[in-house]
Amino acid sequence: MLTIKKLIIIAIAILFAISSAAQNIKKAEWSKVKMDSSWESLAEQGKESKSTKIINKYKPAVDELNVVIGEAAKDLPAHSPESELSNFAVDAIREFADKWLSQQGIEAKTDMAVTNFGGIRLSNFPKGDITIAQVMACFPFDNRIVILDMPGKYIRQMLQAFARRGRVEALSGVELYIKANKVERFRIAGEPLKDDKIYKVATIDFLANGGDNVYSFKNAVGMTNTNVQIKDMIIDKIKALTAEGKKVDPKVDGRVKIEK
C-alpha cells in the first residue's frame, strides 16, 4: 500500500494538473514549507502549520485513493507474450465491451480484444489488498475503450507484424502460435481467421489510432468509442469481484505461444 506522503504527492499532482488546465488562471503562487521538526512544535503550541493545512486540504482525495477495493490472490506479473496481469486486463476489456454492446441494444459480441503492455505500468501487481491508487499507478493513462470493426486481413497483418518484431501485445479471445518470427497458427473466437470477414475487436483508443506501431487498426471500417477509461473499468471490475466474494486471481492459459 502506498504511504500517506506518496499519496499526498499523487493527489496534489493530479489536482494541480487539473487546475493548471483551466483557462482563467493568470498567476501561480507558491511558498516554501519546511519539512522539519517545526511541524511538531507548532502542533504542541496548538497552531496549524502550513504543511498541516496542505495535508488537511488534500486528505479527502488521498483517503479516497487509499480505499481498498479488492484483493489479489497472488502476485500478478505483467510481461509478453502473456501473463496473469495482462490476461486479467485484456479479458476485462473484452468482457466490458460485450456488456456495453448489450446495453446499447446491440446483439453482437466482440471476437477478440487487444491492449498494449506499455499501458500496464507495473511489472508486478503485489499479492494482497488492492487500492484505487494502485490501479491508477498500474493504468495511469487516460486510454478509453473502443470497439473496432476490423477486416480479417488486417488482423492477420497485425499478427504478422507482432511475429516479425518478436513481441506480442496482450490478447483475448484468440489462440496464437508463432515460430521463428512467423505466425504458424491463429484462431479467433475458436475458428480460423477469415480475411474477408469483419470482426469486432475491443481495444483502447491509443492503439486504434496507431499507437505502439499497431498501424493495422487504422484500417478499421468502423469504430465505436465507449468513452470509458480502462482504469475506471478495471476499478469497477475489481469491485464487482469483491461484491461476489472473489479475489483477483487470473491464470496464464497458453493463449499465446512463441518458439524461436
Please give the residue ranges for each predicted region:
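Short, functionally important structural connectors and interaction interfaces within domains
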Residues: A17, V68, P77-S80, D142, ...
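N-terminal targeting signals for Sec/Tat export/insertion, comprising classic cleavable signal peptides
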Residues: K32-E64
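Short, flexible segments with low predicted structural confidence
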Residues: P60, E64-N66, P126-I130
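Mature, extracytoplasmic segments of signal peptide-bearing proteins
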Residues: H79-F88
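Bacterial Sec-dependent N-terminal signal peptides
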Residues: M1-W30
